[in-house]
Amino acid sequence: MISIITPFHNCPELIPDYEKAVQGAQVIVIDNASEEDTAVKLQAMVGRLSNDSKYIRNDVNQGYSKANNQGLAIADGEIVVFLNSDIVSAGDWSDRVKNAKKGAFYAATTGVRVVDGEAIRYLEGWCLFGHKSDFEMIGGWREDWEGMYWEDNELCWRAEMAGLELKQVDLPLLHYSNYTTSRTPGAYDKRPSNQALFERIVRQDKNNG
């Protein structure tokens, strides 16, 4: 089984395309304190999806990482997909996810951050997947981030430190980059401090290694 975990915060206009993209999987929606009309629409969507799908509502926005960990804790699938809500599918992509092997994380797109002159590769978190046991092995998503950004960088850094591979796969998915972030008040405010935290983590790990 594949479990798809998606935090939602408002933006109900994304629901139709999202629903089309996740057919056939267990879908776990973490509603991060959306407005009531959005919450009603999200619950209705989950009701139309697989019988194994689940809806959790947070009264307060818990942020991206905590929401992902909430979903990870209740996922029934051997493979879990952390998927953003602002996506469109151009075809079936489940077979490529089912081929995921243990010992690696996968994503549709990758990026690079530079810390002290060293390029550090990461998988972009808008569609990131792997075996549930591997995510549990590294402790899931780090939760002490404020605002948004750099969560996927740290997760992938920790994964590589634990011996996991980072692999890019071609998926028929389109991501509306920053669509939801730009509509979340304060989302960018902590980006510089999150970057500084990530850089401290990398330096500490290198010094301890």
Stretches found by the model and what they are:
Residues 10-24:
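Short, well-formed alpha-helical segments that are part of the catalytic scaffolds
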Residues 21, 31-42, 87-88:
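A conserved acidic beta->alpha catalytic loop
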Residues 25-36, 54-58:
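Short beta-strand/loop segment that forms part of the nucleotide-sugar
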Residues 58-75:
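Glycine-rich, basic loop-to-helix element that forms the pyrophosphate-binding segment
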Residues 80:
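Short aromatic/hydrophobic "clamp" motif used to bind/position activated sugar donors
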Residues 94-106:
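Conserved donor-nucleotide/metal-binding helix-loop-beta segment in metal-dependent transferases, i.e.
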Residues 106-119:
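Short beta-strand-to-loop element that shapes/binds the nucleotide-sugar donor at the catalytic cleft/hinge
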Residues 147-209:
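C-terminal catalytic/acceptor-binding lobe
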